A protein has these predicted regions:
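Short beta-strand elements in bilobed, periplasmic/extracellular small-molecule ligand-binding domains
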Residues: 1-3, 90-95, 110-131
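Hydrophobic alpha-helical segments within soluble ligand-binding/sensing domains
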Residues: 10, 66-91, 132-134, 158, ...
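Hydrophobic alpha-helical
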Residues: 14-43, 109, 121-122, 127-186
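Short beta-strand segments enriched in small/hydrophobic residues
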Residues: 24, 29, 63-64, 90-98
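Flexible loop/hinge segments that line or gate small-molecule binding clefts
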Residues: 32-72, 181-194, 243-245
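Proline-centered loop/turn at the N-terminus of a beta-strand
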Residues: 46-50, 90, 174
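Short, solvent-exposed amphipathic alpha-helices that sit
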Residues: 73-80, 101-119, 132, 136, ...
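Hinge/cleft segment of the Venus flytrap/periplasmic-binding protein
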Residues: 101, 111-113, 180, 202-248
């Protein structure tokens, strides 16, 4: 079930799953805190939860967590930016404070660029939405004459920033996202594109490990309670290795 980024809807969907008598739930929470009441209901019903990608705040209510090394996903973007701007520069940060995985990405990015001459001009909470990022970036472009780079906690936000940058003819700005989605890789591969890199994860590996973990739980076998998948930079130097037609 897709919650369409609506925490209340997701909680409602989980109650429907409980009523259906499902054996297990794979969960990527819209909001890592607001999901708690639904998790308590699942626990009371004896339904194990395999938490994916974004870790819930109270991990005691889940059976396992399979996700990406989100801090590293942001860190590799910051490291790449330092190579492009060795003297530092002026940057913007687009985040999503309600999603812990995005918070970790931004933390990793800021750790990578600390003490390297970078100034954060402003930050925006765009909830990972392309349209919100687009509208906010248009305002920032009017507000700041000098912007060297933009770090986005999701590729979707980065694509919105890219749209605004392209419309304003500001391709001198370096844009980073995180996820490694096909559309982001397609933009990175374009000659002259301002989208220069993404801290990539592998949903394929997450899904594979999640399925194996669920089977182990249901069959009462041993399993790893926490699995962290590798994250890595995809930029113009290596995007062809990963392709643009699907996820890695």
């Amino acid at each position: 079930m897709g919650a369409e980024n609506d925490a209340s809807k997701q909680n409602q969907q989980i109650q429907e799953m409980i009523d259906m008598g499902v054996d297990a739930v794979f969960l990527c929470p819209v909001d890592w805190e607001e999901i708690e009441s639904a998790l308590e209901a699942l626990k009371e019903a004896g339904i194990p939860v395999i938490n994916l990608d974004t870790q819930v705040k109270n991990s005691d209510l889940t059976a396992a967590f399979i996700g990406s090394d989100n801090k590293n996903a942001g860190y590799v973007c910051g490291k790449d930016l330092k190579e492009k701007c060795p003297d530092g520069g002026k940057i913007l940060i687009f985040e999503d404070k309600g999603i812990n995985s995005v918070n970790e990405r931004i933390t990793g990015f800021e750790q990578a660029i600390s003490n390297a001459g970078f100034e954060v001009l402003n930050r925006a909470d765009v909830n990972g939405e392309k349209q919100k990022a687009y509208e906010q970036m248009k305002e920032f472009l009017k507000q700041y004459s000098e912007i060297n780079a933009v770090m986005c906690g999701t590729d979707e936000g980065a694509l919105g920033v890219l749209q605004a940058v392209n419309e304003m003819g500001r391709k001198d700005i370096y844009i980073y996202g995180t996820d490694g989605c096909p559309q982001a890789k397609e933009e990175i591969a374009k000659e002259g594109s301002a989208f220069v890199g993404t801290g990539a994860q592998s949903p394929i590996n997450i899904g594979k490990d999640a399925a194996e973990t669920a089977m182990a739980i249901l069959e009462d076998k041993d399993y790893e309670e926490k699995i962290q998948e590798e994250t890595f930079i995809i930029n113009k130097d290596n995007v062809e290795l990963y392709g643009t037609n699907g996820w890695q």
